[in-house]
């Protein structure tokens, strides 16, 4: 992995690439301590371009990527194997826009769920996805797993709250559809293919979500 690290280091700042065992450990263990990852490198991009650059390098080096959000899952979905790179979205955590007229909020994948709820509340709106782990889970993980939560019977799963999505695809391409239209009949609804795919079809980087 040393050659991979050498190629990634110029693309990220000094907090963007973790290789020390002590620094990596929190990204390798899930909450129940039932599964333990084996990766030797964690990349922490802070922009969509950095995510794309990491994916491009991993394609070139034939390295598998394990996207990781808040690492709050209980089934080992974000745990890496030896030789894989953990890509943490925790630094990609900006709220890009709140559109009160359209009742939407556009957020990056690393936004913690409770921060989205609070931002909606400050705008006198409501975001219905609510989970026990909302203080530490990230919206990218909620989308990748199509999380439910306590309001699922009234408002539906997380996929029901999504109007637009942005993601980096396995070939390094950018999928960008953050228009936020509530009625959009233009072709395939590709964002719904990415939601619930747990990172297997792309790395979600941002989403436009419904507010109420």
What are these regions (language model features)?
Residues 23-26, 43-44, 49, 57-60, ...:
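Feature of Fe-S/electron-transfer and energy-metabolism proteins
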Residues 1-56, 73-103, 132:
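N-terminal flexible segment immediately upstream of the FAD-binding catalytic core
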Residues 65-70, 126:
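A short, small-residue-rich loop immediately preceding and capping a beta-strand
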Residues 38-65, 141, 149, 173:
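Soluble FAD-dependent oxygen oxidases
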Residues 94-212:
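FAD-binding subdomain of flavoenzyme oxidoreductases
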Residues 69-72, 112:
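Ser/Thr-glycine-rich phosphate-binding loops at phosphate-binding pockets of nucleotides
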Residues 20, 68, 90, 130, ...:
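Generic beta-strand/beta-sheet core signal
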């Amino acid at each position: 992995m040393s050659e991979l690290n050498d190629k990634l280091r110029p693309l990220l700042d000094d907090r963007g690439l973790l290789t020390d065992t002590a620094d990596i450990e929190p990204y390798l263990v899930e909450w129940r301590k039932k599964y333990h990852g084996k990766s030797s490198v964690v990349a922490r991009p802070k922009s969509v371009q950095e995510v794309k650059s990491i994916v491009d390098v991993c394609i070139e080096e034939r390295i598998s990527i394990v996207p990781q959000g808040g690492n709050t899952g209980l089934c080992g979905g974000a745990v890496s194997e030896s030789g894989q790179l953990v890509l943490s979205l925790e630094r990609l955590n900006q709220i890009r826009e709140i559109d009160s007229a359209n009742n939407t909020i556009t957020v990056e994948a690393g936004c913690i769920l409770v921060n989205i709820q609070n931002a909606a509340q400050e705008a006198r709106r409501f975001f219905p996805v609510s989970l026990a782990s909302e203080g530490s889970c990230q919206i990218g993980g909620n989308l990748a797993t199509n999380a439910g939560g306590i309001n699922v019977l009234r408002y539906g799963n997380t996929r029901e709250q999504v109007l637009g999505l942005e993601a980096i695809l396995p070939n390094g391409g950018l999928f960008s559809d953050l228009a936020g239209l509530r009625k959009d009949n233009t072709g395939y609804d590709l964002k719904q293919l990415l939601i619930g795919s747990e990172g297997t079809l792309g790395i979600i980087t941002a989403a436009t979500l419904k507010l109420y």
